[in-house]
């Protein structure tokens, strides 16, 4: 498995049988490097969305039309995407598991909002924000938390799914900050590898993972902090 960070919460995950984008926020992402786009979309099989905010939906519509990739998201967000001309959709909701060829995706809780703001300035709710747990045939189980605060039912995510890889938001203001994210990882999970995200993009969120790294001192997990465009191979 190759996991490439594309800035903010965007990741490209490649296995022997799938090429996946999670939350492909490219256009307008201060951290994204345009030269990464071609490789990130080549041969793409799936786009997975944690929630409906623009910095997570990102370029989904354009990429889905360009590649024909299947898009998985919560039901309300899928209905909105359908109105944008996307037909290969896999709608679900919290607690549901969907088979996507060589892997499954399970919607789990996240404490956050999910909406799009139209040109008139009105915010329209697009279902629940979620984390996503991905179970693969022959690869480690991965948990992308989406945008969230710490919550005690993270213990159930560990009990039910036993994720080996955790992708964790740490940037503060819109998600938990680094110290709280480290507490969540240390208290509730037994990750082999932990990858922080949702930092170093917009100036109003934390710019480095240092607080998170300090909070993970003594943990048995590997904390991987690739540069944007860098990858972790497992």
Swiss-Prot record:
Recorded GO molecular functions are:
hydrolase activity
SUPFAM superfamilies linked:
Metallo-hydrolase/oxidoreductase
* Keyword terms, alphabetized: Hydrolase
Q: Does Hydrolase appear among the keywords? A: yes
Q: Name one Pfam family in it.
A: Lactamase_B_2
Q: Which NCBIfam families match?
A: PRK00685.1
The record's comment on protein family reads: Belongs to the UPF0173 family.
Its protein name is UPF0173 metal-dependent hydrolase R01310
What is the native source organism of this protein?
Rhizobium meliloti (strain 1021)
């Amino acid at each position: 498995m190759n996991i490439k960070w594309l800035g903010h919460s965007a990741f490209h995950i490649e296995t022997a049988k799938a090429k996946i984008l999670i939350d492909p926020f490219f256009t307008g992402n201060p951290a994204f490097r345009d030269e990464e786009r071609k490789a990130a979309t080549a041969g793409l099989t799936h786009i997975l969305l944690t929630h409906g905010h623009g910095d997570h939906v990102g370029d989904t519509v354009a990429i889905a039309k360009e590649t024909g990739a299947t898009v998985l998201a919560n039901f309300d967000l899928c209905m909105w995407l359908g109105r944008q001309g996307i037909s290969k959709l896999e709608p679900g909701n919290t607690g549901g598991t969907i088979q996507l060829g060589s892997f499954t995706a399970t919607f789990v809780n996240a404490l956050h909002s999910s909406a799009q703001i139209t040109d008139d300035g009105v915010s329209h709710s697009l279902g629940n924000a979620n984390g996503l747990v991905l179970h693969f045939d022959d690869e480690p189980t991965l948990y992308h938390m989406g945008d969230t605060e710490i919550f005690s039912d993270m213990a159930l995510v560990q009990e039910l799914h036993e994720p080996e890889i955790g992708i964790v938001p740490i940037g503060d203001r819109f998600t938990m900050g680094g110290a709280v994210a480290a507490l969540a990882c240390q208290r509730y999970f037994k990750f082999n590898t932990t990858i922080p995200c949702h930092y170093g993009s917009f100036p109003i969120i934390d710019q480095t993972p240092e607080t998170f790294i300090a909070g993970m001192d003594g943990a048995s997990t590997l904390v991987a902090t690739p540069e944007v465009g860098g990858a972790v191979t497992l």
